Amino acid sequence: MGYSKRFALYISVMILIFAIAGCGKSDETKEGSKEEQIKKSFAKTLDMYPIKNLEDLYDKEGYRDGEFKKGDKGTWVISSVMVKQPKGEIMKSRGMYLFLNRNTRTAKGYFIVDETSNDTLKKTEDKEKRYPVKMVNNKIVPIDPINDKGVKKEIENFKFFSQYGDFKELKNYKNGEVSYNSEAPIYSAKYQLKNNDYNVKQLRKRYDISTEKAPKLLLKGTGDLKGSSIGHKDIEFTFVENQEENIFFTDSLEFTSSENY
């Protein structure tokens, strides 16, 4: 074989090798970019944390699409719930949901106390109690009289995670467990945190968390990654998760149409 032919063959082989390698890198880049897309999608609301004064949301507009009727300024939906299930005991949830209507500049919701028992010999039993609340001058107060002084105090002292959480370091979270289903669409990114993480310390400060295990942070959402008023975005700090014991905290801040609020 002549020199020119051997050289041409060498060039062809090298081009093929680079092409194969390039495809691998392209796939890695796409996976990495998907993680970045998820973080950027969540950052649209998480960058607002901490929201010291929730009434500031009356003047804050979120993502709008065709689901909003003309003239509707939208409603912010906030929730924070702590769920605990010690070994051998029932699952208990305590938290709050608040709906801030930007049209009426009023905020109402409810404090929830929920107990769920799952006996293999019986049907799952769910006992839920809701206490209606409203927000006045950035303070949560019960709408109806409450005889239980402990619950009343818990409501009046309640703070949403969005009021003290801070995600300025979100962009620095790396190597998350990424899941994405474009057909649903459903997406998530999970990160192992450390106990010295700011948000973890804030949760331990406010809640009696029995385990010393550092939690995993899960960012999970539905709908178009680029934005959708139909989809949902939730964050979850999971300290313990197994069949015998569960300890996790969930938080959400959504902007939606005011049709149902």
From Swiss-Prot:
<dbReference type="InterPro" id="IPR007595">
    <property type="entry name" value="Csa"/>
</dbReference>
<comment type="similarity">
    <text>Belongs to the staphylococcal tandem lipoprotein family.</text>
</comment>
<keyword id="KW-0472">Membrane</keyword>
<keyword id="KW-0732">Signal</keyword>
<keyword id="KW-0564">Palmitate</keyword>
<keyword id="KW-1003">Cell membrane</keyword>
<protein>
    <recommendedName>
        <fullName>Uncharacterized lipoprotein SA0398</fullName>
    </recommendedName>
</protein>
<dbReference type="Pfam" id="PF04507">
    <property type="entry name" value="DUF576"/>
</dbReference>
<feature type="signal peptide">
    <location>
        <begin position="1"/>
        <end position="22"/>
    </location>
</feature>
<feature type="lipid moiety-binding region" description="N-palmitoyl cysteine">
    <location>
        <position position="23"/>
    </location>
</feature>
<feature type="lipid moiety-binding region" description="S-diacylglycerol cysteine">
    <location>
        <position position="23"/>
    </location>
</feature>
<dbReference type="InterPro" id="IPR038641">
    <property type="entry name" value="Csa_sf"/>
</dbReference>
<dbReference type="GO" id="GO:0005886">
    <property type="term" value="C:plasma membrane"/>
</dbReference>
<keyword id="KW-0449">Lipoprotein</keyword>
